[in-house]
Amino acid sequence: MKVKVVYLGVVRHKVGRKEEEYEVSEGSSLKDLLTKIVEAHIALKDLAGSLNDSQIDPTLIATLNGFAVNLNSSRNVILKDGDTLTLMTVIGGG
């Protein structure tokens, strides 16, 4: 299965690209994909935190096909062929 990943803001800056496509196995979870992304882009490790402990930085937010997803529950989200994951950080200021 192919899943498109779009990077915005700080995440795009750390990754160095706008988007890319990942090949994942049937039945893969969002956690599986996040692990692949961090392995490919070690600069995201600070935001992804410890994926094994589900302690992802709360400033990292994601949408899957345009709907918000809780990254700390990523092992419960099963991906489908053609999904689009968007990763970004919270924008703040004042």
Tell where the protein language model's regions lie, with residue ranges.
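Ubiquitin-like/PB1-type beta-grasp interaction modules and other compact soluble beta-rich domains
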Residues: 1-93
